[in-house]
């Protein structure tokens, strides 16, 4: 839940202007909108990567407004970022090494990493998520875009979480990977997770979401139930227009 969330962009101007948003357990809220209307800044603020100027963000009863990304992960936040190379993975690391980024504590015995467990879990996820790689020791940068994204999705969805942020989850991936990622997100919904999907692809937002909110100039200008939403209605809201209720 966010309440009156206000966030500045890199230019110092307000990019998110008083955002109120509630996502329930077992619900997917999709955010539609032309890119550059505050979506990136909103996601970065929720993930702890950008300062919240005003307002609040909480998961359940836990206020996470001023917490670190690590604290948010520990409280049940998973984040599939829009730029996997900048925010989610390191090309020079192996698939195994990327699979434990941010969740190293889950694979440690005291101060020592349990490499056998890391290898076993990574190979389990490679099979489960159909990650096409010779083995878990291959460098992440050597994988195709779709398989890179599957590594990030596997890591973020397999850890303990309550709230999942999926930002442009299928950008730059092939059709087969898109279907697999969509199915995985919908499976998480059945586990009573609260899920936020942000995508520039209207078809993606419409196929995954229970409700669709449209962002325009840093504000949510309309929320439609999936059965009410049409590309025409969403397009009008995305352009700053109004629709008849």
Task: Show which residues each predicted segment covers.
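Glycine-rich phosphate-binding loops of nucleotide-dependent enzymes
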Residues: 1-245
């Amino acid at each position: 839940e966010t309440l009156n969330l206000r966030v500045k962009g890199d230019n110092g101007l307000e990019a998110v202007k008083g955002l109120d948003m509630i996502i329930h357990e077992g619900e997917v809220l999709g955010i539609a909108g032309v890119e550059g209307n505050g979506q990136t800044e909103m996601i970065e603020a929720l993930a702890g990567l950008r300062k919240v100027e005003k307002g609040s963000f909480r998961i359940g009863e836990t206020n996470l407004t001023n917490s670190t990304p690590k604290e948010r992960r520990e409280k049940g936040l998973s984040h599939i970022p829009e730029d996997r190379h900048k925010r989610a993975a390191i090309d020079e690391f192996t698939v195994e090494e990327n699979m434990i980024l941010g969740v190293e504590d889950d694979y440690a015995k005291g101060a020592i990493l349990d490499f056998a467990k890391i290898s076993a879990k990574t190979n389990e996820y490679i099979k489960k998520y159909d990650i096409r790689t010779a083995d878990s020791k291959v460098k992440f940068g050597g994988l195709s875009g779709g398989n890179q994204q599957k590594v990030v999705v596997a890591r973020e969805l397999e850890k303990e979480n309550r709230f999942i942020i999926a930002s442009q989850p299928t950008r730059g991936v092939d059709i087969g990977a898109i279907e697999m990622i969509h199915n995985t997100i919908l499976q998480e919904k059945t586990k009573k997770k609260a899920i936020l999907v942000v995508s520039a692809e209207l078809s993606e937002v419409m196929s995954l979401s229970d409700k669709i909110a449209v962002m325009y100039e840093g504000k949510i200008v309309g929320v439609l139930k999936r059965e009410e939403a049409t590309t025409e209605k969403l397009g009008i809201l995305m352009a700053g227009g109004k629709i008849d209720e």
